[in-house]
Amino acid sequence: MDFDIEHGDHSTTELILQYKYLAIVGLSPDPSRESHRVAAYLQEQGYHITPIYPDDSKPILGQKVYKTLSAALQDKHKRGETIFVVVVFRKPEAVLEVAKEMLQNDPIPLVFWMQLGIKNAEAKALLEAKGVVVVEDKCMLVEHQKLF
């Protein structure tokens, strides 16, 4: 699907933001980190967040933490839940591996959202070839506040 979120297609952004089940890759347990602040805001707005973080020993924002995106997607699927959007807070050079991991799962989430400052052309091309909607270099919190 070819959505023009880059040039202010608010109807597309609004459509994407209707998906309330998110996996957040790189969600830090540290409240001073941007990923934590954005996730807390989204949770307050009614989104169901699934944290993906290397240390899964303690919940983040009251939610079970998964070490990998695949572990989260598989566990949620077994429980009859679907993650529709993967939100990424990782360095651009790490994004391709996250995209590849996501595509190894079934069902594949519908949207891959790279937060502000994050772009990866190779990951974008790979995901779009599989029908995934890709958003780059946009803050989900900011986009949500613009519309709601």
Question: Could you say what each language-model-derived stretch is?
Answer:
Residues 54-55, 71, 115-119, 138-142:
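Short, acidic/turn-prone active-site loops that include or flank metal/cofactor-
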Residues 103-127:
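ADP-ribose/adenylate-binding Rossmann-like module
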